[in-house]
Amino acid sequence: MNRRELVEFVNMCMIKNGNRVLVQDRVSPDWPGITFPGGHVERGESFTEAVIREVKEETGLTISKPQLCGIKDWYDDEDYRYVVLFYKTEHFSGELQSSDEGKVWWEDFENLSHLKLATDDMSDMLRVFLEENLSEFFYYKDGDDWLYDLK
Protein backbone atom coordinates (compact mmCIF):
# COMPACT_ATOMS: atom_id res chain seq x y z
CA MET A 1 0.00 0.00 0.00
CA ASN A 2 1.45 3.33 -1.09
CA ARG A 3 0.95 6.00 1.58
CA ARG A 4 2.45 8.86 -0.40
CA GLU A 5 0.29 11.77 -1.36
CA LEU A 6 0.74 14.96 -3.34
CA VAL A 7 1.12 17.91 -0.96
CA GLU A 8 1.73 21.61 -1.46
CA PHE A 9 3.25 23.47 1.50
CA VAL A 10 2.81 27.19 2.04
CA ASN A 11 3.32 29.40 5.08
CA MET A 12 1.84 32.46 6.75
CA CYS A 13 3.45 34.52 9.51
CA MET A 14 1.86 36.72 12.17
CA ILE A 15 4.48 39.33 13.12
CA LYS A 16 3.59 41.16 16.32
CA ASN A 17 4.90 44.54 17.40
CA GLY A 18 3.29 45.35 20.74
CA ASN A 19 -0.49 45.42 20.18
CA ARG A 20 -0.06 45.71 16.40
CA VAL A 21 0.41 43.04 13.73
CA LEU A 22 1.88 43.28 10.27
CA VAL A 23 -0.74 42.88 7.54
CA GLN A 24 -0.58 42.68 3.77
CA ASP A 25 -3.26 43.76 1.30
CA ARG A 26 -2.74 41.13 -1.38
CA VAL A 27 -3.28 42.22 -4.97
CA SER A 28 -3.52 38.70 -6.42
CA PRO A 29 -6.83 38.17 -8.24
CA ASP A 30 -6.86 34.56 -6.97
CA TRP A 31 -6.70 35.55 -3.30
CA PRO A 32 -7.12 39.31 -2.75
CA GLY A 33 -7.56 41.05 0.57
CA ILE A 34 -5.81 41.55 3.87
CA THR A 35 -3.85 38.71 5.42
CA PHE A 36 -0.43 37.97 6.90
CA PRO A 37 2.69 37.68 4.72
CA GLY A 38 3.81 34.26 3.53
CA GLY A 39 4.10 32.02 0.51
CA HIS A 40 5.27 28.73 -0.95
CA VAL A 41 7.92 26.42 0.43
CA GLU A 42 10.41 25.72 -2.35
CA ARG A 43 11.84 22.28 -3.07
CA GLY A 44 14.89 21.58 -0.89
CA GLU A 45 14.06 24.43 1.50
CA SER A 46 13.27 23.93 5.18
CA PHE A 47 9.92 25.21 6.43
CA THR A 48 11.64 27.75 8.69
CA GLU A 49 13.92 28.99 5.89
CA ALA A 50 10.85 29.38 3.67
CA VAL A 51 8.89 31.58 6.07
CA ILE A 52 11.95 33.77 6.74
CA ARG A 53 12.54 34.16 2.97
CA GLU A 54 8.89 34.87 2.15
CA VAL A 55 8.55 37.51 4.87
CA LYS A 56 11.76 39.20 3.64
CA GLU A 57 10.57 39.19 0.01
CA GLU A 58 7.11 40.54 0.82
CA THR A 59 7.86 43.00 3.64
CA GLY A 60 11.57 43.89 3.66
CA LEU A 61 11.80 42.61 7.25
CA THR A 62 14.13 39.87 8.44
CA ILE A 63 12.36 37.78 11.05
CA SER A 64 13.99 35.49 13.58
CA LYS A 65 12.73 32.86 15.99
CA PRO A 66 9.56 32.05 14.00
CA GLN A 67 7.43 29.71 16.08
CA LEU A 68 5.30 27.10 14.34
CA CYS A 69 1.91 27.53 16.02
CA GLY A 70 -0.50 25.57 13.83
CA ILE A 71 -1.59 24.44 10.38
CA LYS A 72 -4.50 24.82 8.02
CA ASP A 73 -5.05 21.93 5.64
CA TRP A 74 -7.52 20.57 3.11
CA TYR A 75 -7.83 18.30 0.07
CA ASP A 76 -8.96 19.65 -3.27
CA ASP A 77 -11.37 17.81 -5.58
CA GLU A 78 -8.49 15.82 -7.08
CA ASP A 79 -7.25 14.59 -3.66
CA TYR A 80 -4.30 17.00 -3.69
CA ARG A 81 -3.48 18.16 -0.15
CA TYR A 82 -2.66 21.75 0.78
CA VAL A 83 -0.93 22.54 4.06
CA VAL A 84 -0.51 26.12 5.33
CA LEU A 85 2.06 26.34 8.13
CA PHE A 86 1.16 29.07 10.64
CA TYR A 87 4.10 30.87 12.24
CA LYS A 88 4.31 33.78 14.64
CA THR A 89 7.15 35.94 15.90
CA GLU A 90 7.89 39.20 17.66
CA HIS A 91 11.52 39.24 16.51
CA PHE A 92 12.36 41.21 13.38
CA SER A 93 14.74 43.78 11.97
CA GLY A 94 14.92 45.93 8.86
CA GLU A 95 12.80 48.55 7.19
CA LEU A 96 9.20 47.82 6.25
CA GLN A 97 8.54 48.01 2.50
CA SER A 98 5.68 46.82 0.32
CA SER A 99 6.22 44.47 -2.62
CA ASP A 100 4.49 43.31 -5.80
CA GLU A 101 2.44 40.98 -3.56
CA GLY A 102 0.74 43.97 -1.92
CA LYS A 103 1.00 46.89 0.46
CA VAL A 104 2.13 46.10 4.03
CA TRP A 105 1.58 48.07 7.24
CA TRP A 106 1.22 47.74 11.01
CA GLU A 107 -2.40 47.44 12.14
CA ASP A 108 -3.87 47.44 15.64
CA PHE A 109 -4.84 43.85 16.39
CA GLU A 110 -8.37 44.78 17.50
CA ASN A 111 -9.02 46.47 14.11
CA LEU A 112 -8.46 43.30 12.05
CA SER A 113 -12.12 42.29 12.09
CA HIS A 114 -13.08 45.65 10.51
CA LEU A 115 -10.80 45.20 7.47
CA LYS A 116 -11.52 43.54 4.11
CA LEU A 117 -9.86 40.24 4.96
CA ALA A 118 -8.66 37.79 2.30
CA THR A 119 -10.75 34.95 3.75
CA ASP A 120 -14.08 34.73 5.55
CA ASP A 121 -12.54 32.31 8.04
CA MET A 122 -9.74 34.64 9.17
CA SER A 123 -11.19 35.06 12.67
CA ASP A 124 -11.02 31.29 13.22
CA MET A 125 -7.54 31.16 11.67
CA LEU A 126 -6.49 33.76 14.25
CA ARG A 127 -7.68 31.43 17.00
CA VAL A 128 -5.19 28.80 15.81
CA PHE A 129 -2.42 31.42 15.83
CA LEU A 130 -3.28 32.55 19.35
CA GLU A 131 -4.90 29.75 21.36
CA GLU A 132 -2.46 27.18 22.73
CA ASN A 133 -5.12 24.44 22.83
CA LEU A 134 -5.64 24.70 19.03
CA SER A 135 -3.14 23.56 16.42
CA GLU A 136 -5.12 22.65 13.30
CA PHE A 137 -7.72 24.22 11.03
CA PHE A 138 -8.98 21.35 8.86
CA TYR A 139 -11.32 21.88 5.90
CA TYR A 140 -13.34 18.97 4.55
CA LYS A 141 -16.17 18.44 2.10
CA ASP A 142 -19.61 17.26 3.14
CA GLY A 143 -21.45 16.71 -0.12
CA ASP A 144 -21.09 20.00 -1.99
CA ASP A 145 -20.41 22.03 1.15
CA TRP A 146 -17.02 22.95 2.61
CA LEU A 147 -16.91 22.70 6.40
CA TYR A 148 -14.06 22.98 8.88
CA ASP A 149 -13.01 21.85 12.32
CA LEU A 150 -10.61 23.51 14.70
CA LYS A 151 -8.52 20.95 16.57
Predicted regions and their residues:
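Conserved N-terminal beta-strand and adjoining loop/helix that marks the start
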Residues: 1-21, 37
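Short hydrophobic/aromatic beta-strand or adjacent loop that forms the aromatic wall/cage
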Residues: 8-12, 82-86, 123
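Conserved hydrophobic/aromatic beta-strand scaffold that supports enzyme active sites
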Residues: 14, 23, 86-88, 106
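Conserved Nudix-box catalytic region and its N-terminal flanking loop in Nudix hydrolases
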Residues: 20-56, 144-151
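A short coil-to-beta-strand element that immediately follows conserved catalytic motifs
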Residues: 62-70
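Active-site-adjacent beta-strand/loop module that shapes the phosphate/pyrophosphate-binding cleft
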Residues: 73-95, 127, 133
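NUDIX/MutT-family hydrolases
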Residues: 88, 97-130, 149-150
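Charged phosphate-binding loop/patch that engages nucleotide di/tri-phosphates or the phosphate backbone
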Residues: 128-151
